[in-house]
Each structure stands twice: as C-alpha cells, then as structure tokens.
Amino acid sequence: MALPDFSMRQLLEAGVHFGHQTHRWNPKMAPFIYGERNNIHILDLSQTVPLLNSALKVVSDTVARGGRVLFVGTKRQASDIIADAANRSAQYYVNARWLGGMMTNWKTISNSIQRLRKLDELLAGEAQGFTKKERLNLEREREKLDRALGGIKDMGSVPDLMFIIDTNKEAIAIQEAKRLGIPVVAVIDSNCDPDQIDYPIPGNDDAARAIALYCDLIARAALDGIARQQGAMGIDVGAQVEAPVEPALQAPAEGA
C-alpha cells in the first residue's frame, strides 16, 4: 500500500476552501487565508495540500510503529463519519461527547470501561437472575456507557496521536492531549487557533463532504501504516526461531 492520493479538485468539490464569515475569523489564521468572497473567507488550498500530506504521513508512521490513533469529532455532521472511519481502519474514536479527564484521568475512565465490559457479559448471557426491570436498567446503563466509551473500549491506554474535527468544539480534548504530550492532527477552519495544533490541516470543518474526505484519507493512511507494520513483522518473523504470540490471542491482563 501507499499513502492515499487526493487532488486539488477533490478538495474544491468537497468545499474544503470555504471558511466562515469574515467577521468570525481568528486573526491567527491570516497566513492560511487566500482571500474573501461575499464576506466568506477562502482558505489557501495550496497550503492545505502539503499540510494534509504531512498529516497523512504522520498517521501512517504512527500506526506503522504500533501506535494508536484516536479520531475525535462530536458535532452532529461528523459523528457517524468519525466512527465509520475509525472502525474501518482499526483505530479508536470519541463521537458523542468528550468527557473531561478522558485522557488525563485514564484510570477512572478505565474503571468505567471495565463496567461496560461487565455489562456486555451480563447482557450477552441474557442477564440470568435479573427481573425485567433490573435488566432494563442494566441495558440503559450499558447504552449510556457505550455511547460515551464504546469507541475507546479496546484502546488499552491513551493514544499515540489524535485526529480532531472542529478544534473549537473539542478544545478540552486538545488541552488534555497537550498536557500528556500527545501530538494532534486537526482540521483548522478560519475561526480556529492553529497554535495548539501539531499537524494543522487548513480547511472547512462544517461541510459533511469535507469531513468525509478528511476522515477517509486519515483512515486510509492508518491502513497504510497497518500494511507497513505487517510487512515489517513478516520480515522479522521469518528470521525468528520461535513465532511470537499475537497480542490478540493472549489472555487480557488483570485490570486491563
């Protein structure tokens, strides 16, 4: 595999170049703005192209060395797209609401994930011994936990990289990433602060077509990383006397 290809035409057709109304801009975005049309800022796609390529490379490189990527997008038009892209590329996601401390208080989050796993087991076994009302309460609790944590249930620990749609809405997620030294790839619209982002992608963060394009490219970059990792493992495994045990086949550690 190789890094996913994209063209300037695809970016234009998806509306990536359309920023917000000029009065809503963040002056820090001035270097990324090409001009304005009908009081709407137009983003400079000649900068978006190389920056998006850099973002795709860091995603692929992170996954190739065994790292995890967390997709974050909780706004209505991003939610389903984020989950689909993460699932398709064997990564992780938060698409309902960012809970404060989701990264910085991972121990507490892990306890909630353990509770979610327990509920999965109970309900898969038809919740023997519970009344109809008790079962309904368990199902509601599970549904609530799954909505918040289902996308990170199997992540194991904090991610190695975060990909974010809408840096204003996901400001807490970015703050937590900064505190933990987790690099951030993010789409930055004309009303965003680019200073907080390690790998910025200047572009529209509201149009569903634009969001779908970013997520598809990031997912394909992650898949490229998986292919590279498997290729490297194939070389290493062939040279070893004993085959390594796949992590997925090992019994989960106590408290994991």
UniProtKB/Swiss-Prot annotation:
It holds the Pfam family Ribosomal_S2. It comes from the Bacteria. Gene3D superfamilies: Glucose-6-phosphate isomerase like protein, domain 1, Helix hairpin bin. The keyword Ribonucleoprotein applies. InterPro entries: Ribosomal_uS2, Ribosomal_uS2_bac/mit/plastid, Ribosomal_uS2_CS, Ribosomal_uS2_flav_dom_sf. One of its GO terms (biological process) is translation. Keywords: Ribonucleoprotein, Ribosomal protein. One of its GO terms (molecular function) is structural constituent of ribosome. GO terms for cellular component: cytosolic small ribosomal subunit. Signal peptide: none annotated. Belongs to the universal ribosomal protein uS2 family. This is Small ribosomal subunit protein uS2. It comes from Brucella canis (strain ATCC 23365 / NCTC 10854 / RM-666). The lineage of its organism: Bacteria, Pseudomonadati, Pseudomonadota, Alphaproteobacteria, Hyphomicrobiales.
